[in-house]
Amino acid sequence: MTGSSIGVAVVGAGMAGRSHAAGYRTAPTLYDEGLPEVRLVAIADVNQAFASDTARRYGYERAENDWRALAEAPDIDVVSVVVANTLHREIVEGLLAAGKHVLCEKPMAPTVEDAEAMVAAAEASGREAGVGFVFRRSPAIAAVRDQIASGVIGRPLHFNGHYWCDYGVDPRAPMSWRYKGGPGSGALSDIGSHLIDLAEFVCGPIRSVRGASLPTVIAERALPLGAAVGHAAAELSDKTEPVENEDLVTFTASFASGATGTLSASRVAYGLANSLGFEVFTESGAATFDLARAGEFGFIDPTPAGPGQGYRQVLVGPAHPYLTRGMPMDFPGVGYGQNDLFVFQARAFLEQVAGLDRLPRVASFGEGLHNIRLLDAIAASAKNGGADVVVD
């Protein structure tokens, strides 16, 4: 920390970068216990206009067009890295070497080698380093996890999850870094990494995968004439380039607990902008979650006893993780969404940096490395006709 305050910055001014910027802005207002003063210092992006607009919008002091300016700045302590994952390693290693605490967006890196190097850099730096698996901060998902971990409904038997989006369903969607990088770097890496971490968060570690398929359904895309943010449409040029990675992924997972999982992720799910959901069935119960109804979850437990009872609706509130005194209105029925999760995540990481121990820590770089190994295993299964692949 810089004296008695924490200076924060964000690398990347796209939609996820803006989510981090907004999260840091609101995080100090959560809970009764105070943090040190949080200073909103800088937004960096190679597109200066994007950086300036995001800094203005969220109240940051300045905008930069190079992440190195953040590394060199003595008034910055914490940096979120929210750019294409092919750029993560250089930026993260540079920031850690400069003494910054780093929260890196998922997926942590494009390769296991890069992720291992980032883990080593974090360990050598002695700084806090975390990975942005933001769905761990969902009160409803964390409540389901707690019910399973406590043994209330027994061990998990089957997890069925999906993350379906439609940002790539239009053939006129412009070419971007999301469509480059080879098999495993598309829908699997971009949104599947979230789903995989969520599955392990709820059911424990995955030991092997099989039956993976990584099809590409739109073979080429037009280059944009100018810069585009996130999944936004853009004016297109006459030049096209081939899509190098998958539009969707399906696979089966075996968990260390003995449970089986069926998972799918897609960026070409027509009409579904951001559909994340799962069901988990256990020895004596079940739970279900739908991100479109993020302020609730469905639950079946042994009371009343007997099959056929169906799900009962549970509205999240002060009895569930992260919520007590966490929002101006924290009672059931208020409702929470994905944007709120970035606030909870920012608060947790700031507390880690401040040396506080009141909230579950964000995912570690070691956990981020494990996620990359899982992505590799799924890609290997697909490459080998759906073979069973053990996760290293």
Predicted regions and their residues:
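Beta-strand-loop-alpha-helix segment that lines the small-molecule cofactor/substrate pocket
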Residues: 78, 84-85, 89-137, 151
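C-terminal glycine/acidic-rich active-site capping loop/insertion
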Residues: 134, 218-246, 250, 254-255, ...
